[in-house]
Amino acid sequence: MLALHEWGDPAAPALLLVHGLTESAAAWPDAVARWSSRYHVLAVDQRGHGVSPRWDDEALARAPQTMQEDLERVLSSLAEPPVVVAHSLGGLMSLRAGAARPDLVRALVLEDVARPTGHWGPAPWFVEHQERFLDAFADGGAAERERMRRESSWSDAEIEGWAGCKGQVDRRYIREGTYLGEADLVSAVNRLTVPTLYLAPRHGDMAPDPSEVTNPLVRLVLIDGVGHCVRRDDPEAYHGLVDPFIEKAFGNAGR
């Protein structure tokens, strides 16, 4: 079972946070601080991240399916279906899990979902890029922290959470497991049967074309002036859309 971290009142409506590549449950500090007074906030460490199990040969041979099944097991263990809030790689796994097992999900909030391209093995250029990126944190990442303070508008808490995850990444997953399988983003979005808010940067390269999204349960919002990490780049825009959506999903049950 994946490591699961919790904040807030266990009797409150549940949110499940699912992080992206090279991050962990520790990568949501501002969201946790904002939501934990109203909701039971849970956050997973995906396999090979944080303190969750590492990868083995069998799991790597079917990495996308393994990650989806990991998430479905977590969802099945919860007392009631949560609103799932997910980013990038976590967004893709949450999208696929929500399409396959809508009985386990109350609603979805997806942030710039990683777009699968139909590949069944890691791209060498991507592996090299990620290895170099993670190598920059071998000394604790002080230079990377300072770079983000100069170049981004992220809060200090978000920068520290983002940087602190890197040393816990299973490098074997980076080298052998970073492929996403079937190019099913649009078809999965249009199969969803749960309310879904899908946020992405207007000038990004991973979101579906709005004309392709025909599912009336899915609201795709393209946001100006942000990059891949929408909630960090523009928390006001992110929460202005996400918080009312969560409240509506729970029928205003959040406290």
Predicted regions, residues:
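Catalytic active-site module of serine/aspartate enzymes centered on a nucleophile-bearing elbow/loop
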Residues: 217-255
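Flexible "cap/lid" loop of the alpha/beta hydrolase fold
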Residues: 99, 104-137
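Active-site loop/oxyanion-hole signature of alpha/beta-hydrolase fold enzymes
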Residues: 33, 42-85, 240, 244
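Gly/Ala-rich beta-loop-alpha elbow adjacent to hydrolase catalytic centers
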Residues: 86, 90, 94
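Active-site signature of alpha/beta-hydrolase-fold catalytic machinery across serine-
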Residues: 30, 96-100
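Conserved HGGG/HGGXW glycine-rich cap/lid loop of the alpha/beta-hydrolase fold
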Residues: 5-54
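Conserved alpha/beta-hydrolase catalytic His-Asp/Glu region
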Residues: 119-124, 136-190
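Conserved loop-alpha-helix segment in the C-terminal half of the alpha/beta-hydrolase fold
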Residues: 195-232
